[in-house]
Regions:
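Structural microenvironment flanking redox-active thiols in thiol-disulfide oxidoreductases
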Residues: 1-63
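Short loop/edge segments at beta-strand edges and connector loops
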Residues: 71-73
């Protein structure tokens, strides 16, 4: 959530050349789970895909991501394949090959956002050749 403005800036800068997509996998701090003080999202962990979709929509309404948001299956297919927990950027090249898996740690999305321009510049230069 704290990295939203950084990510939105990347979408503004690279969005004409790069497809950005956020995948809502699961609530990081549900009520009765790994709660954090002053969490602006006081929600229960979803038990159905419809509930997860509603949480993703609420998240987007509050956070205003400037990219499409899709939702993982309730059995966590994307989470199991890409291991993006808690937050992680995964970069695919134009052929769908994973070229970078961001940092999976507190603050990892912010740090990945700082590193992403260099990576995207290199990838876009390669694809132009």
């Amino acid at each position: 959530v704290r990295s939203t403005s950084m990510i939105n800036s990347l979408v503004d800068e690279y969005g004409k050349d790069v497809n950005f997509l956020m995948i809502y996998i699961r609530e990081a701090h549900p009520i009765g789970g790994r709660e954090v003080p002053n969490n602006q999202f006081q929600v229960n962990a979803p038990t159905t895909l419809i509930q997860r979709c509603e949480l993703a929509e609420d998240f987007d309404d509050r956070i205003q991501m400037q990219m499409p948001i899709v939702v993982d299956t309730i059995d966590d297919t994307v989470a199991d394949v890409y291991a993006p927990w808690p937050n992680r950027m995964v970069v695919l090249d134009g052929n769908g090959k994973i070229v970078d898996v961001g940092i999976a740690a507190a603050g990892g999305t912010r740090e990945s956002s700082r590193q992403l321009p260099g990576l995207l510049d290199r990838l876009l230069k390669k694809e132009d050749n």
